[in-house]
A protein has these predicted regions:
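Cell-wall glycan-active module
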Residues: 1-60, 156
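Alpha-helical segment that forms one wall of the substrate-binding/catalytic cleft
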Residues: 38-45, 49, 81, 86-136, ...
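Extracytoplasmic
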Residues: 53-56, 76-79, 118
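Secretory-pathway/luminal and periplasmic proteins that interact with or process carbohydrate-rich
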Residues: 67-73, 131-137
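His/Met- and acidic-residue-enriched segments that coordinate or traffic transition-metal cofactors
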Residues: 73, 77, 155
Length: 156
């Protein structure tokens, strides 16, 4: 192949392998449009910032979890604003009833999932269904709840 042909080959979009889109902090995802303006909003923003989580993403997560209800408890035992599961609470050593700790450790746990899976979309799936489910299915698990959760928070 001569130099000109090689250059044409390198520049040909058709011949280049597809590039996977990997969501990053800079990826376009919907901004937070919730109506909540209470005392936990700035606490959640600060927790996201300290843990390297996109602020709007974390605000949408908290909104989706229990609508900013600090006393919320799910039927599965998840607690507080960030709906931390009992096992996660034990792992992180936090008081889930303290809204600031709950948000801080929710953001920290989400960041840990991002570091594990390399994608905010998969981090959200792991936050909802558990990291084992994301590993088992090598992506967002086929659970309706988890798929809806990721779609609502991530936006697609």
């Amino acid at each position: 192949m001569d130099n000109r042909s090689a250059q044409q080959y390198n520049n040909s979009i058709r011949l280049q392998p597809p590039r996977a889109a990997v969501p990053t902090i800079a990826s376009k995802s919907p901004s937070y449009r919730g109506r909540y303006a209470g005392p936990y909003l700035n606490v959640a923003r600060a927790a996201a910032r300290r843990n390297g989580v996109p602020g709007d993403l974390f605000l949408r997560l908290v909104q989706q979890e229990r609508g900013w209800n600090a006393q919320a408890r799910s039927v599965k035992g998840a607690m507080g604003l960030a709906q931390l599961m009992p096992g996660t609470v034990r792992l992180l050593g936090v008081n889930p009833s303290d809204p600031a700790q709950n948000l801080e450790d929710g953001a920290r746990y989400l960041r840990t999932q991002y570091e594990t899976f390399g994608s905010w979309r998969l981090a959200l799936a792991a936050y909802n269904a558990g990291p084992g489910a994301v590993q088992k299915y090598n992506g967002v698990p086929p659970y309706k709840e988890t798929r809806n959760y990721v779609r609502i928070i991530w936006g697609n």
